Amino acid sequence: MQRLWRFDLDGSNASLILPEIAPVGYHKWINESTVVMFVLGSPATLQVGDLETGQARILTEDIGRSIHNIPGTEDISYVQRHEDGSATIMRLPGRGGPPERISEAVSQGDFHAWTPDHFLLMTDGPLIFARRYEPGASWKQIADFSDLHLNLSRLAVSPDGAQIALVAELDALELPAN
């Protein structure tokens, strides 16, 4: 069962964090005592855990598999799925308050990432899209990997913003008939 654990950097002093919460798929820290977790299930939930009280609360259900710290803030972003198949990227204020809408997701996408200079990135099949983190900004295609026959999913940006790592699956190629 996937759970959150805390260790010293040398691997010693292992301790289970929030033992009642499992299975934890992804997590991000707001501060030293508050963690936001993607908890697997049907549906998956977004939970906020307080290490001081040992309690967690469900914030919302049916979220995407991508949660991130928003650069330069204590805020967290996540993808909220909707019954009609659409999805919205949401911001959870780190200092409290209700979630707020950032933008509609690209093509019902699950995966997003942030650059250090506040660009939001999303994948859609072989494409990568970007938009500024500001009201009224729109998505713009910035890369196309169609020639490589890749179906992109997860992405991560290096802390300095100089590199992007991608998880991709090779599309099934149609072979010519004999």
Residue positions per predicted region:
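Sequence signature of WD/YWTD-type beta-propeller architectures
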Residues: 1-178
